Amino acid sequence: MKKYEILGGNLPVVVCELSAGESMITESGSMSWMSPNMKMETISGGGMKKMFGRLMSGDSMFQNRYTAEGADGTIAFASSFPGAIKALDIRDGHSMIVQKSAFLASEEGVELSMHFQKKLGKGMFGGEGFIMQKLSGNGTAFVEIDGHAVEYELDAGQEILISTGYLAAMEETCTMDVVTVKGVKNMLVGGEGVFNTVVRGPSKVILQTMPISKVAELLTPFFTKNK
């Protein structure tokens, strides 16, 4: 990829400039606009195991590959929700674990696969999802962030306590666990839920300020009170 630019503030789009022959991989339906010489091809992106993994994580079983044919090309991918688009530098030894359905697009050298939480309870009770997505290989990947992205660099053994839904991404070297909110009264009337997610360093953690699940929870009463 020659270059990219993220535009639009909190209604973002990433515009990618490709050299002739270069390709971008994206989920079905993610392309917003492109130059006429961009050729689309629907691909499986791997064997049945990877296809099933994408289906389990809430994505389409197939992906689209866009290639600049004969000359340089332009292609744009817009976010599906108000927030941010984050560019991640993926390379050998620096894989990223991201929230389910965060993947927007990437260079062809990036591999998208499912990532199971090692303990079932971490995903079910921590609110981050039993299945997350793993970005590995080499290249630039773009992911969607719900709201504003806040980054922390954790030292080895350093921890951060995260409320349900606010974990957007973390490097693979981080570990994740789930803890219960202390005190029965806090659990029942504190309004913060029963479980929190603990991420332990070393490496980078990316948090988001407006999880879709929280927005849906706040809006639900307005759609149902007249029924």
Question: Which residue stretches match the model-derived regions?
Answer:
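Composition-driven recognition of glycine/serine/threonine/acidic- and proline-rich low-complexity segments
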Residues: 1-227
